[in-house]
Amino acid sequence: MNKKSPNYFTSARKTFSKEIHSLSNLSKKINQKKYNEICELILNCKGNTVLMGIGKSGSIAAKTSSTLSSTGTSSFFLNAAEASHGDLGSLKKNDVLIIFSFSGETEEIIKIFSACKLKVKKIV
């Protein structure tokens, strides 16, 4: 049996190339003015920077919150499904809430959006 071994490094290099291309395209789609406004909101936040989502968007929000916390920004993740069952109480008036959603029409987020507006300083 003379089976040819796959070249894992070549496969990894192709994956890296695709990821670099995707990030390059993403950076072209981001509105620079809005991005800077969000950064200013986070930097000037007197409370917590709260990141909320559900599903895959929630996973990204949780990771982003963790990264913010590790850089000294007061931040925590709020699962949208849990929020409607009591966790909204963790939101305070000086907090900034950043909602992660692929569609912008997630039922769990829509259901609690009005309550969130009453509790925090700003929603992104």
Model-derived regions, located:
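Glycine-rich phosphate-binding loops that contact phosphosugars or nucleotide phosphates
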Residues: 43-124
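Generic detector of short alpha-helix boundary/capping microenvironments
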Residues: 6-7, 49
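Intrinsically disordered, low-complexity segments enriched in polar/charged residues with Gly/Pro
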Residues: 1-2, 75
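An N-terminal, well-structured beta->alpha segment
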Residues: 1, 7-44
